[in-house]
């Protein structure tokens, strides 16, 4: 969170490459102790915050270096489905369980991001965690559209009113509806929303 306070050192922080892992460090899923909920939250942040996201191959099917942590050969293992001897084929989506869910999750998130102007052209404002709420919030916004990401890393669920953050950037209307990017439903930003432990809300809002 506080790394952003050094953004002034760079001519254009929005054009810096950001990543969760790469070929020289343990894979994200392993770093997160194979916690799928943390993995989803981490990628929601990566694909929403400022910068150009880099997603290492195999991330979308939860590849891990747990068998030999940090080993370069393990970090750069073949993507499953590229060889006749592979029992699964992620190239054709012939995978199951969490791997399939992760692939669909990332596909949905990336397709949404592709045409989301606030992510590509907008400003960023964040609300660092406090001892009272223990949640982290970022907003990406342009004149007529805003993206809100609320992350709850606490052990307890949190109650959040999206308008409390949105109105600090631009006043909203009564009964203003935002779109939940993950659940694909509408949310009244003036209502209290429960965010479970180790979970997040990603909302897309038009003015």
Predicted feature residues:
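Active-site neighborhood of glycoside hydrolase catalytic domains
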Residues: 5-7
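Short, flexible beta-strand-to-coil junctions
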Residues: 141-143, 182, 206-207
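Solvent-exposed beta-hairpin/edge-strand motifs
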Residues: 165-184
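C-terminal beta-strand-rich structural cap/linker in extracellular carbohydrate-active enzymes
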Residues: 187-207
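Loop/helix patches that line or flank the sugar-binding groove of alpha-linked glycan CAZymes
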Residues: 10-170, 195-196
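Short, small-residue-biased leader/transition segments that mark boundaries at the very start
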Residues: 1-2
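Extended, compositionally biased low-complexity polar/Lys-Gly-rich tracts
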Residues: 103-107, 181-187
């Amino acid at each position: 969170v506080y790394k952003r306070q050094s953004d002034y050192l760079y001519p254009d922080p929005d054009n810096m490459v950001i990543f969760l892992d790469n070929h020289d460090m343990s894979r994200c899923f392993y770093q997160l102790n194979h916690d799928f909920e943390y993995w989803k939250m981490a990628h929601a942040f990566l694909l929403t915050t400022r910068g150009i996201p880099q997603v290492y191959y195999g991330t979308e099917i939860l590849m891990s270096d747990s068998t030999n942590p940090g080993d370069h050969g393990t970090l750069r293992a073949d993507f499953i489905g590229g060889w006749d001897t592979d029992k699964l084929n992620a190239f054709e989506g012939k995978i199951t369980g969490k791997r399939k869910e992760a692939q669909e999750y990332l596909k949905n998130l990336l397709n949404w991001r592709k045409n989301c102007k606030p992510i590509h052209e907008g400003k960023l404002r964040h609300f660092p965690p406090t001892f009272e709420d223990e949640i982290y919030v970022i907003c990406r916004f342009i004149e007529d559209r805003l993206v809100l990401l609320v992350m709850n890393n606490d052990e307890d669920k949190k109650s959040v009113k999206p308008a409390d953050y949105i109105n600090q950037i631009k006043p909203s209307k009564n009964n203003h509806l935002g779109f939940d990017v993950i659940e694909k439903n509408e949310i009244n930003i003036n209502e209290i929303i429960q965010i479970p432990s180790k979970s997040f809300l990603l909302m897309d809002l038009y003015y």
